[in-house]
Amino acid sequence: MLGRPKLVLASGSPRRLALLNQAGIEPDALRPADVDETPIRGELPRACANRLARAKAEAALQSIQLDDDLRGSYLLAADTVVAVGRRILPKAELTDEASQCLRLLSGRNHRVYTAVCLVTPKEAFRQRLVETRVRFKRLSEEDIAGYVGSGEWRGKAGGYAVQGIAGSFVVKLVGSYTNVVGLPLYETISLLGGEGFPIRHGWLNAG
């Protein structure tokens, strides 16, 4: 679209990019933000997701302010946190971490929080937090070993990717499925449209 304002996605996540593409939105640039995602001691899951999404947006904003082509763009950042009660699970990088996450999730309810932070061309910050409740079946040691062997969990909040093999572990999901994938699509599109970003599809009137 000629004259469409630019959109920068402050993420290197293929899943978040694919979800935006699914909604007919193609970011003009990707600016993954390098922030420390370690939870603060005693930090609650909601607060952690909100803080990290904001931190990613602020870091990416500093980057695009130095780029003549991207300065004044819309900027979208997000962070996903998986928690059992108040316990925040790691974004697993090691097999032991993944195994521990899966044992903790086995047969239990957990919550997935994704905070979305939008920075407008006038550098106003707008934020939404979406919560989804998920219940896993009871996982056998064979289930856990097989999934860990797949490698799908690497870098994923809570040590699993719901859009892959782990989707077969889900007994019940209440709320946004795309939130569990990494970007709550309805809320994200509503946020963009509500701040004046042109949404291509007519199926959503983001007022």
Curated annotation (Swiss-Prot):
Chief place where the protein resides: cytoplasm
Alphabetized UniProt keyword annotations: Cytoplasm, Hydrolase, Nucleotide metabolism
Gene3D superfamilies referenced in this protein's UniProt entry, alphabetically: 3.90.950.10
Swiss-Prot/TrEMBL cofactor(s): a divalent metal cation
Catalytic activity from the UniProt record: dTTP + H2O = dTMP + diphosphate + H(+); UTP + H2O = UMP + diphosphate + H(+)
GO cellular component: cytoplasm
Cell compartments where the protein resides: Cytoplasm
UniProt record similarity statement: Belongs to the Maf family. YhdE subfamily.
PANTHER family: BIFUNCTIONAL DTTP/UTP PYROPHOSPHATASE/METHYLTRANSFERASE PROTEIN-RELATED, BIFUNCTIONAL DTTP_UTP PYROPHOSPHATASE_METHYLTRANSFERASE PROTEIN-RELATED
Protein name: dTTP/UTP pyrophosphatase
Species classification: Bacteria, Pseudomonadati, Pseudomonadota, Alphaproteobacteria, Hyphomicrobiales
